[in-house]
């Protein structure tokens, strides 16, 4: 039986020498791989009490939406700044070469709601940390952070210390 990592394309020396790029598009392009990825992520949510699934732009949408559908939960978009039409709150965070800003609608999370945050990959943890801070600012509680792939060598879990973090596939390097 194939595992999710069997569907992940690994590209050496991209975007720079010494890096192995883990390409999730190869998972999405295979019906069996996509189904397996969603099923494995859903298994990591067994026993998790949540009210809302939220996904980080853009691949968090790809994996978060089917999970919300399976669990019969609403789905909330965490978007790059300037993409949401209604009143938002925003959070800036550090990137390797600069900063980025994400935002969420002010009415997307109600006080006391239990939220699962979803993204395709955890690297440094900056995006998901900022997303968690937005949820908490609105009065929500982050009960799980869920990723298809984790690049353990980039130590994103340290940034997310105190949160329940789950990953389907863990690669030890960067």
Locations of the language-model features?
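Short, glycine/charge-rich flexible loops or terminal/linker lids adjacent to PRPP-binding catalytic cores
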Residues: 74-116
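Short Gly/Thr/Asp-enriched flexible loops that form oxyanion-binding sites at enzyme active sites
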Residues: 62-71
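Short glycine-rich phosphate-binding loop at a beta-alpha junction
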Residues: 49-57
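Residue-level signature of catalytic and energy-coupling elements of molecular machines
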Residues: 18, 53, 75, 145
